[in-house]
């Protein structure tokens, strides 16, 4: 791993000495510059000499109590005695001391002190007062971690970071709080935390070392970094942060892109509150596309037609909304069905079957109707199919009737075939034929069952990766005004969704 990891503290928490030592060594090989050793995870009395024998970088000694999110099971006196042993052992450069005990343990030689406060059950109303008191303690770094109850709680942590009077690391736990784990670096945090092994469940919402390093490039984040993100619910599965951050790095744009989980019905409040950061632009996914169109102050023709937006860009007087799925669908079809220098895409007299009636289906239906195609919509809920078909002068089909008529182009806008249900297809193989164009918007995996069967039957195929990269590229251009690095964006996405995922990003 060649990326700069100096702004990541790698957290290691294992029960067995052997595994602790092994993970410390491996973290060093992967480039870790600072490791927090969660001694409260060690099942037996820790043998510090054994654990520290091959340490590759500075270490933080942490022994967390259950009320602070830890696993320490013995007495408090024993915990404080062990902390003192760590401090005088010569093996730790840092020690983490909770605010209520920091004044009881004196500074020793050059060992630096993190004075910390954790509340993983709630967001304290007096957090600012707690922070002010902590700043009066003998701390080299003040650390605040509290449970986010809403996306707006990230902003309170950011405000604390903005007003910090000494080095501070303040972020929220849980998936609602993930943005602050990354954005604290913009506001002066000396480092953020990441798990060596995410599956170990060291702390709620704690990302992995590889994830932070590969996706967010923390070494590039500074006070001038612009902020973008994707908003949706759920959002943890999104590959948009990987793709957009890779594009920013490729084009040397000083920006970072983070995921925001926002529940249905709360987008307007979220957009208003995050004006304080500010977030310069958003990708918008389920369930907020219609709400995004309504929240925008200005919009382009694609949003007017589809009444849905997948992109919001901050302007001086509010948000501008666009639907980049619309041009991306046409661009993917044009690349597949036309030749360079030849006539433009002509869909007149073409019969198109669209499977689904959600956001992407709406963009496809309106784009192809305007391009001259005859559009049929098949959906499990016939009422939704009828509503969309009426908008594009098309025909609605019950899901069971989707094989009724032959077509020139079929676009799957349903999740059928998406991981983990990779052995499913929305169409019978017998429906597919040579000369047909089969466009599957599912991109995990890229080669879905539908795509495989279409190739076998001699049909022309367009994959969901093509669509994803084109719509993300159009968003990148709206965000930055620059031409998107589509090749690089496609490369990192395909690597991420491949059966064997590599972690050696260059």
Regions found by a protein language model. Give the residues of each.
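NAD(P)-binding Rossmann-fold cofactor-contacting core
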Residues: 35, 371-392
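Active-site beta->alpha loop and helix N-cap motifs at the rims of alpha/beta catalytic domains
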Residues: 5-125, 146
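Phosphate/diphosphate ligand-binding glycine-rich loop within oxidoreductases
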Residues: 225-339
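Glycine-rich adenosine-cofactor-binding loop
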Residues: 172, 227-235, 321-326, 333, ...
């Amino acid at each position: 791993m060649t990326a700069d990891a100096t702004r990541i503290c790698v957290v290691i928490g294992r029960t067995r000495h052997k595994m602790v030592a092994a993970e410390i060594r491996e973290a060093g090989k992967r480039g870790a510059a600072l490791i927090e050793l969660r001694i409260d995870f060690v099942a037996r009395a820790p043998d510090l000499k054994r654990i520290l024998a091959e340490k590759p970088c500075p270490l933080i000694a942490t022994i967390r109590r259950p009320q602070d999110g830890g696993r320490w099971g013995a007495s408090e006196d024993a915990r404080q005695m062990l902390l003192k042993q760590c401090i005088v052992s010569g093996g730790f450069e840092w020690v983490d001391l909770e605010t209520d005990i920091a004044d009881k343990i004196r500074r020793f030689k050059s060992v630096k002190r993190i004075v910390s406060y954790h509340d993983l059950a709630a967001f304290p109303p007096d957090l600012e007062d707690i922070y002010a008191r902590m700043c009066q303690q003998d701390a080299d770094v003040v650390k605040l971690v509290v449970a986010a109850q809403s996306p707006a709680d990230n902003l309170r942590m950011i405000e604390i970071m903005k007003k910090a009077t000494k080095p501070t690391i303040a972020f929220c736990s849980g998936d609602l709080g993930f943005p602050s784990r990354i954005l604290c670096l913009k506001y002066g945090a000396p480092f953020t935390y990441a798990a060596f092994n995410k599956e170990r469940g060291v702390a709620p919402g704690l990302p992995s070392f590889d994830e932070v390093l590969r996706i967010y490039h923390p070494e590039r984040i500074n006070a001038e970094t612009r902020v973008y993100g994707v908003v949706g619910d759920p959002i943890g599965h999104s590959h948009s942060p990987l793709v957009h951050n890779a594009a920013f790095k490729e084009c040397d744009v000083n920006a970072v892109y983070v995921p925001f989980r926002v529940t249905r019905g709360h987008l307007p409040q979220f957009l208003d509150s995050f004006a304080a950061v500010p977030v310069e632009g958003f990708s918008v996914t389920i369930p907020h596309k219609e709400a995004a169109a309504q929240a925008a102050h200005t919009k382009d023709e694609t949003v007017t037609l589809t009444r849905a937006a997948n992109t919001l860009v901050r302007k001086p007087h509010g948000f501008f909304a666009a639907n980049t799925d619309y041009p991306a669908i046409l661009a993917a079809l044009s690349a597949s069905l036309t030749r360079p220098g030849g006539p433009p895409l002509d869909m007149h007299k073409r019969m198109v079957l669209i499977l689904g009636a959600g956001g992407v289906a709406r963009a496809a239906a309106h784009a192809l109707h305007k391009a001259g195609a005859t559009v049929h919509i098949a959906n499990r809920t016939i009422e939704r199919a009828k509503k969309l078909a009426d908008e594009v002068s098309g025909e609605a089909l019950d899901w069971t009737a989707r094989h009724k008529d032959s077509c020139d182009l079929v676009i799957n806008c349903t999740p059928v075939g998406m991981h983990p249900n990779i052995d499913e297809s929305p169409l019978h193989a017998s429906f597919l034929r040579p000369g047909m164009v089969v466009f599957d918007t599912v991109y995990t995996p890229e080669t879905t069952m539908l795509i495989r069967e279409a190739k076998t039957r001699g049909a022309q195929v367009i994959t969901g990766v093509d669509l994803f990269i084109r719509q993300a590229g159009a968003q990148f251009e709206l965000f930055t005004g620059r031409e998107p690095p589509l090749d690089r964006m496609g490369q990192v996405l395909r690597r991420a969704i491949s059966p064997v995922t590599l972690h050696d990003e260059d």
